[in-house]
Amino acid sequence: MASSGLAYPDRFYAAAAYAGFGAGGATSSSAISRFQNDVALLLYGLYQQATVGPCNVPKPRAWNPVEQSKWTSWHGLGSMPSAEAMRLFVKILEEEDPGWYSRVPEFNPEPVVDIEMHKPKEDPKVILASTNGTSVPEPKTISENGSSVETQDKVVILEGLSAVSVHEEWTPLSVNGQRPKPRYEHGATVVQDKMYIFGGNHNGRYLSDLQALDLKSLTWSKIDAKFQAGSTDSSKSAQVSSCAGHSLISWGNKFFSVAGHTKDPSENITVKEFDPHTCTWSIVKTYGKPPVSRGGQSVTLVGTTLVLFGGEDAKRCLLNDLHILDLETMTWDDVDAIGTPPPRSDHAAACHADRYLLIFGGGSHATCFNDLHVLDLQTMEWSRPKQQGLAPSPRAGHAGATVGENWYIVGGGNNKSGVSETLVLNMSTLTWSVVSSVEGRVPLASEGMTLVHSNYNGDDYLISFGGYNGRYSNEVFALKLTLKSDLQSKTKEHASDGTSSVLEPEVELSHDGKIREIAMDSADSDLKKDDANELLVALKAEKEELEAALNREQVQTIQLKEEIAEAEARNAELTKELQTVRGQLAAEQSRCFKLEVDVAELRQKLQSMDALEREVELLRRQKAASEQAALEAKQRQSSSGMWGWLVGTPPDKSES
């Protein structure tokens, strides 16, 4: 997805120069020697695709295998757009050498300076405890490198999240213990006042460690977890596989790790369960047809089910399929919903009123989205309802957390830089507003961070960890939320002052009615007002109309099904008749062929009969000629005997 820092195409050219391509670096041969062969060839092909375009040069001769391999890598990209080739080039370089951006100062003109966050309306009184127990002045600004802060002179020592007293402003937390390794694309969840961090990506390597932050003492600790692959005790010595882009979901006193990218991906999604009491990972046996392996998906807890949407599979193919895992039976269900959103990954999802699934943002390989999609889990129909307030900017890799009817969105990238605003969406009125904003390249404006919600001493807090914006982060920030009534009034004020962002529907639905349904289902809605009865009557009338229309559609569907069944029966009969006719035709064809063979044999016999007749005729003629000759000879003999008798010649004794 998009990364913060330099905007494209400058980020691409900086990456190309660092890798050894272009005028700012060495030749492509040096790049091939720097990386593994397959990576170097892929970088070469993407660089040529981004700077030259599709490969139109002839294939090199076979005696030059290096040039032939480079040509094959370039030619295999086909007609990939230049922008997509640039982003894939940077993404692959970051996976191979995540620290490249910090080592290219000539392409980073902005100096490292302290970045001042927006000041609150009241004077801050926050003082954080240092790692050694002594007090330190309150930080008023955040440095880009996370090490330089400006302070005030007043000193007050507070404990845990109570140290954060400023509302709606992000505050860096000073934590105890050894911090986890910086990372992004990890998973995070809260179980019993502890924030658990699992996996992630650091320097292009997937992680498998499990860390816990005690939200009471703000102390990090590494969990020495065991992995139980089966029922035998010997399997407990194994380790859980490293992963990134997965989802952590709390369930009771345990939590699940769902999906994620791994070094050796399996064919289907794996669900793992961690028990904090036994510090043991185990593989959950599921039933039904599991989704294909993926990462960057969203997994949302809805009642007693997990709803999974989208992501990117092991072949980097974007997905938009929908699957539901029943946590009581551990059975997967592949759902075919109506009006499915475009494929995406690194988006955020939330559940409202145990009925509606909301999807926001995310991106493809070259584009970031700012669209909001709502899935009615009862009718399984997607829609793009009207939104109010300030329209959010496109982003991917952001994090979200729900507090009541409010959905908070933090961070993400938009192909140019990190997104600095912290947004909140009132899911009852679908109204956007800005809660807080930071400036500069700070961890809060990065991708792959996590955001969790915790209630501590009666106050609601948002806690962020990690992220990547050219640098990997392991910083922890907290934002103390205002009272619910204040936040609702602020949301309504933003809704009245902001502009409406009207989006086209994906399916033929009444979106105003859907918004009213969401408001009706919300526990914190305003149906206790004077116009609640009128709204309820209108909703009932609309519901009756929809039910009547649904009944008509169902009747028509039944009729169509009956007609289809009749047509299929007729088709089956015609198919049988056709098969019978084909059998008869085959028999007739066989008989005709046999007759043709007999006729051919008879013709041959007739031809031989003609020859015999001619031979017989010849013999007859020869016989007639012989008989004629014999007759003539006999006549001559008889005449010669008479003359001989007259002259006294005795007859021939042999004739007698």
UniProtKB/Swiss-Prot annotation:
Q: Name one GO cellular component term.
A: peroxisome
**Residues annotated as domain ACB:** 8-102
List residue spans for each Kelch repeat. Answer: 194-241, 254-304, 305-354, 356-405, 406-454, 461-507
Q: Show the PROSITE patterns listed in the entry.
A: ACB_2
Q: Which residues form a coiled coil?
A: 527-636
Q: Which UniProt keywords apply?
A: Coiled coil, Kelch repeat, Lipid-binding, Peroxisome, Repeat
- The primary location reported for this protein is other
Localization terms from the record: Peroxisome
Report the InterPro entries cross-referenced here: ACBP4-6_C (IPR056819), Acyl-CoA-binding_protein (IPR000582), Acyl-CoA-binding_sf (IPR035984), FERM/acyl-CoA-bd_prot_sf (IPR014352), Kelch-typ_b-propeller (IPR015915)
Its tissue distribution reads: Highly expressed in leaves. Expressed in roots and seeds.
Tell me the Gene Ontology biological-process terms attached to this UniProt entry. Answer: lipid transport
Residues binding an acyl-CoA: Y44, G45, L46, Y47, Q48, K70
Expression triggers: Induced by drought stress and wounding.
Query: Which GO molecular function annotation, any one, does this entry have?
Result: fatty-acyl-CoA binding
From the UniProt entry, list the residue stretches annotated as the region Disordered: 129-148, 627-656
Q: Name one Pfam family in it.
A: ACBP4_C
* Its biological purpose: Binds medium- and long-chain acyl-CoA esters with high affinity. Can interact in vitro with linoleoyl-CoA and linolenoyl-CoA. Binds phosphatidic acid (PA) and phosphatidylcholine (PC) in vitro. May play a role in the biosynthesis of phospholipids. May be involved in lipid degradation via peroxisomal beta-oxydation.
Query: Hey, which family's this protein in?
Result: Belongs to the ACBP family.
What is the name of this protein?
Acyl-CoA-binding domain-containing protein 6
Origin organism of this chain? Answer: Oryza sativa subsp. japonica
Q: What is the lineage of its organism?
A: Eukaryota, Viridiplantae, Streptophyta, Embryophyta, Tracheophyta
